[in-house]
Amino acid sequence: MSDTQKQQNFLQGTALLAMATANVKVIGALYKIPLNANIGEQGFSYFNTAYEIYNVLLMVSTAGLPVAMSRMISQASSLGHYNQVRRVYSVARTIFLALGISGSFLMTVFCRQLAAFQEQPDAWAAIGCLGPCVLLICIMSTFRGFFQGQGNMLPTSISQVLEAVTKLIVGIVAAVGLLKFTGSIPLAAGGAILGVTASCLLSAIYLFGCFRRSFRDLPITDEGVTSFGQTAKGLMVIAIPITVGSAGLQILTMLETKLYMGQLLGLGYLQAEADTMKGIYNMTQTIFNMPCAFITPITISIIPAITAQLTLCNDKGARETEESAARITGLISMPCAFGLAVLAEPVTALLGGYTGEKLALATRLMTVLGFAIMFNAVVLVTTAIMQAHGRAGRPVLIMFLGGLLKLAAVYILTGNP
């Protein structure tokens, strides 16, 4: 491990990722606001439907493995077992590639069937264009898991900003261009997705360049390594509970969309009206996710930090890291929660461009979602702490039960407006 990597402690890693997240969120707003203005709530709804399906496959492919990879590399690095670091990377890469190819094939080949299942048949172009991203994200995750396991957050941070800038430029140009030349909102939504695919490709190329240098510089050690099967088993033991929970929540989100759209259509709304209402809901969800994204750097940083401290039997250091993470989470989430709840109307008017009835609906949604930010932040950080301690099963069960409760609420409340 280089001197630069050794100097990156938990707080430095968190700060790097937080700065990258701030830039990514600003760029993301510059991407989604004009995108919503150009392709409308209908097109934005297709865009988000594609993302919901993509997220399910992404969770299956990458939710647990990067965490498992980060933990195992952190353990091996803290003990100076760099041959084992190489072994963990090699095994994880093989698993990632198999999952990525399968996910990309499913989204690309069966895009029309997936769109029909979601009660939005016109979303097929967006779903198909997003298919290659599953493989690209899997490739990127192998590199990010390697760096995060060594406590080096710089490549991940830079790649996130690079990804956001590319998505902004390519996505807006492609969406506006296709809308102008074809007049088709579904194709314009697909064009917006092309920006995501291009950004993933460029980010993967950058991470590969960083990885080659870092991997080549790993010290040569003489310790033995575990077999391919043993290493794969170790990864799976950590990854499967996390993957099941994350994928389960994304599947529940997909079912929520299907249920929501089915209920609206059953109440007599036209397809275009239902798509518009879902688009407004998706935009408020995007705003809700902005503050929560600043908690993610904390969760990414504390897993390898706590794992390394526990490996060296430094319980006091692990506890201090956990307390620091909790304090930072509170400082970020509480002002954001109250701010968005109180200023729901001007925020949705500015970021969503809504007026009239659309603004009234968005304001009501944003007020409720605003207060939920605090609870979501606590869930994210406590889940990461438990994962670092090797106790991933309990938060998975709790989140799954919460998802079922949400599904029941959507069914009851949407059917009785």
Task: Mark where each language-model region is.
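Interfacial transmembrane-helix starts/ends
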Residues: L11, N48, H81-A98, A232, ...
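Interfacial segments at transmembrane-helix termini and the short loops linking adjacent helices
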Residues: R112-L130, D275, A341-I373
